[in-house]
Amino acid sequence: MSEEKLIEYRKKLDTDEGLQGKRKLLVGLSILMLAINFTGAVFKEANTFIFKIEFTNQSGLSYFLLLAVLFLLIRYYTYAHHYHEELYKLWSSRMLRDRKILHYHYEAERVDGLLMHAINVWGGDEPGIQASKYHITGLFQRGLLYPTEHHHEDGIEEYEELISLTNFKDGWRKRDYIKLLGYEFKYQFTAFFKYRENLDLVGPYLLGVSALILTVWKLGLLSSFV
C-alpha cells in the first residue's frame, strides 16, 4: 500500500471524534483501575457541584469499574472494527511487496519468491495474480485472493479467486508454510515499533484487558471457578 494510503489512514484515525472519545475514556478508566490495584489506593469522597459523595463500599466500586471497562472495551471495538480491517491490509500488503515472498516478473509473466510453488496459475492467463491479497480465515488458515473474470454468454463476471496456502502439493511444502507464518509474525511485530497507528489502535485494548485481569485477580473471582 502506498505512502499516500498510509497518510490517509492516519488522518482518518486521528480525526474520528467518536473513536477518539471512546479511546480516551477507555484509556483513562483503565489507567485508574491499574493505579488502584497496584498501589492499593481507595476512594474516600468525590466533590460535585451540588453535593459530596463518600465511597464506603470499595469492593463494590471495583465491580463497578470492572463492568465500566468491559463496556468501554466493547464500545471501542465497535468504533475501531473497520480500522482493524484497514490496518490488516496495510501490514499484509507490505509483506506481499517483499521480493523474498512474492515477486511478479512482468516480462516472463510469472511469480518468484517463497509463494511461487503455491501459485499454480500463469500470469499470462491470470494477470490479476500480480494484485494478490493476503487472506486469513482462521487461526492457521491462509490464502491468496486475486481478481479474475469469467466470460459467459451473459457477459463478464468479475470475482476473486482463492489460492489456499494450506493445500500442500507441487513443491509447496509445510516447511514453506511455516516460513511464511514466520514472515507474517515479523511484519506484524515490527509494525508495532515502526508504524505508530498500530499501537494507537491496539494500545487501549492492552490497557483495558490488563486492568480487567488484574481486577479479577484482586477480587478473587477466579478462585470461585477453580
Question: Locations of the language-model features?
Answer:
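Cytosolic/matrix-facing juxtamembrane and C-terminal tails of multi-pass cellular membrane proteins
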Residues: 1-14, 171-184, 188, 223-226
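N-terminal first transmembrane alpha-helix
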Residues: 1-86, 91
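Transmembrane alpha-helical segments and their cytosolic interface motifs
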Residues: 17-32, 187-215
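Charge-rich cytosolic interhelical loops and cytosolic tails of multi-pass membrane proteins
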Residues: 83-183
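Juxtamembrane boundary at the C-terminal end of a transmembrane helix
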Residues: 211-226
